[in-house]
Amino acid sequence: MKFLALAALFASTVSSIAVDGLIPGARVIPANDVVALKKVGAHHQKHPHRRTVIIRPSFNDEDDVSADFLWGIKWANRGGRLLLQKGKKYVIGKKLDLTFLKDIEVQLDGELKFTNDVPYWQANNFYYDFQKSISFWRWGGEDIKIFGSGVLNGNGQRWYNEFAGQEILDPNNKYYRPILFVTENATRVSVEGITQLNSPCWTNFFVRTKDISFNNVFIHAYSTNASALPKNTDGFDTLNVDGLTVTNTRVDIGDDCLSPKPNTTNVFVQNLWCNGTHGTSMGSIGQYPGVLDIIENVWIENVTLLNGENGARLKAWAGPNVGYGRINNVTYKNIHVENTDNPIVLDQCYFNINATQCAAYPSRVNFTNIVFENIYGTSSGKHGKVVADLTCSPNAVCSGIRLKNIHLTSPAGSPPVIVCDGIQGDIGVECQSSTNLTTKRSIGLARNLKYKA
């Protein structure tokens, strides 16, 4: 295998160290010479001059540089930076366990692209029991910073084509698709500036992670095949996470824009733009029998949601074999929706369960202290005049639900209808029960809608 030396530009201006042993041809630039790189990007605030590691790029889409990448990560670990250069592509074709990290930067200015070798990835991955999730790699440790102007490419089109017509939550589903970016047992992770493109499944999944932030990130999933949509490509999913911050981020994908899942606390979201999504969703939780799930202390502010199924949504499972828990202390503030089927929805009849089954086996997840403030814009009219559907289970508690300054309209006509069933106390606005004859036509198919994961 041939390895590239440093580009002539760097060779002429930067003294570098040839590293014997693992990866011939790679270079490590000492910390005192990093300043010579000048315009390659911003420096870590705490350590402005870091040793920088450069690895060779791929020659083509079949040239797997997984070993080079792992080598570079190890050399950059504990105080260094791995630089993935602008205009270069780095193909990853092997699963990577990166859970040993401490004080590392990865400057992604080029493109990191995964292979679409479906048989390999379905046999070689990191598996999570929660909703049968798999990943290409996993990042863990502490003080991890990923930044730059480059692209993390999941190369998802083949996965979209082959998964068409299937459902992720079908118990018989065996076609597992990798998640693009996973953290596990990680503390203080920062991601900034990059683009995440065409994940085969969820885009981000954070597991047993504390203090993770995303800023100025663009998440995009699109399909070139109109009959094979980029399904389940959620922007952000969490499991056992304390401290998630998402700011100044754009999401254009085929599922939840944001979806904190079981045992997630202390979430802050500000300046988020979502197009074509299933909304900013709390959950789903309560899926697994006998398991306690919690989502608590969430603040979501200044969000635009366009052309989607949902706006601000809470979702909990119902049925004969489900879990229990609570979603508590959640605020949605300054939320702008346009052409959205369900601008505000509390859904305690999730997933694929009709009204009769939900009444027989209601949810055991409590919704408490939920505030929707300054929610404005238009619904799609899919559910008639209904612009908010707040439906709680008789088995669960729904209290402290407050709506303030709601300015939503429907193309189906006026006045807009807010439906509330099973809510304890005053919600702050006029609402009607779904059993009221005057609202039944407005509600339309809302009660029987089968939401996707």
Curated annotation (Swiss-Prot):
- Species assigned in the record: Neosartorya fischeri (strain ATCC 1020 / DSM 3700 / CBS 544.65 / FGSC A1164 / JCM 1740 / NRRL 181 / WB 181)
Official protein name in the record:
Probable exopolygalacturonase B
- One Pfam family assigned to this protein is Glyco_hydro_28
Tell me which positions the record assigns to the signal sequence: 1-16
| Subcellular localization(s) per the UniProt record | Secreted
Q: Which domain of life is it from?
A: Eukaryota
Gene name as annotated: pgxB
PANTHER family (alphabetical): EXOPOLYGALACTURONASE B-RELATED, PTHR31736
Keyword check for Cell inner membrane, yes or no.
Answer: no
Primary role: Specific in hydrolyzing the terminal glycosidic bond of polygalacturonic acid and oligogalacturonates.
Please cite one Gene Ontology biological process associated with this protein.
Answer: pectin catabolic process
| GO cellular component terms listed in the entry, alphabetical order | extracellular region
